[in-house]
C-alpha cells in the first residue's frame, strides 16, 4: 500500500514517532511518503496535501490535525488517526497500538464513511465541514438574529451569540460543549445548536439531510462563518446560508472500536 504520513509539527516527540513509524511501515513492505510540512521538519522531501493520492493517510496528532488533513485534501483518501492530542475523537489509535494494528492488517482495512456538510452563502460554495460550520459575531457581547427554514417553511427564529451547524461526527466536538446531543455517526442529519440563545425555548434541532435547509442572518451586525476551525469567511448582512449533504464524505479506517465505547472512554478520561 501507499501510505502518506502527516504529523503535528509543534511536538518534537510526535515528529520522532512519525519518523520511526515510517521506517516500521517500510519494513512491512509499504510505500511511504511524507506530507511536505512534516517532511520539512524531518529534513526530507514531501508532498502537499493537495497531491495526496494514496491508499491511506496516517495522521499523528489530535482532532485538529485530522480536520486540517481532511479539509486540505483535494481527493478524500482513507484516514487513520494516531492520537497525539488532548482527546482525539477522530484519532482511534494510541501511539503504542499502531505497530500491532498495522502488523495485523497487511491486506487492507475496513473503511467507514462520515458525512460532511456542504456550506454555501448566497449561492456561493465555501467548502465542506466534517465537524461543523460556526456562524459567530466578530463583536464580543453582541448577539445575532437567525431564521431557520426547512423546505421553505419557517422552523425557528432566535437571537444568540452564534450558531453551530454540525454533522453527527461533530456532535462530540464544539456542539457537545454548547449543549448539543451526542449523535450516532451512522445517522445522517444536520445538527443545529444555538450558542447562548437569548430564549431558553431555542433548542438544538436535528434535521434530515433529505430536507432543504437554509439559515438567514437577520441582522446588520458583522459576522463570520468558520468551517472546521480551518477557513473563515466574512458574512454580509442578511446573508443566506444553505446547508447540504456533501457528495464527498470523509473516509476513516475503522479499527474495530465501537463508537459509544470510544465516547465513554474519552469523556471519562478528559
From Swiss-Prot:
GO terms for cellular component: cytoplasm. It is found in: Cytoplasm. It comes from the Archaea. It catalyses: NAD(+) + ATP = ADP + NADP(+) + H(+). GO terms for biological process: NAD metabolic process; NADP biosynthetic process. Its main location: cytoplasm. Its EC number is 2.7.1.23. NAD(+) binds at residues 63-64, 131-132, 142, 159, 161, 172-177, 196, 230. The active site is at residue 63. One of its GO terms (molecular function) is ATP binding. Its cofactor is a divalent metal cation. Belongs to the NAD kinase family. Involved in the regulation of the intracellular balance of NAD and NADP, and is a key enzyme in the biosynthesis of NADP. Catalyzes specifically the phosphorylation on 2'-hydroxyl of the adenosine moiety of NAD to yield NADP. This is NAD kinase. It comes from Methanoculleus marisnigri (strain ATCC 35101 / DSM 1498 / JR1). The gene is nadK.
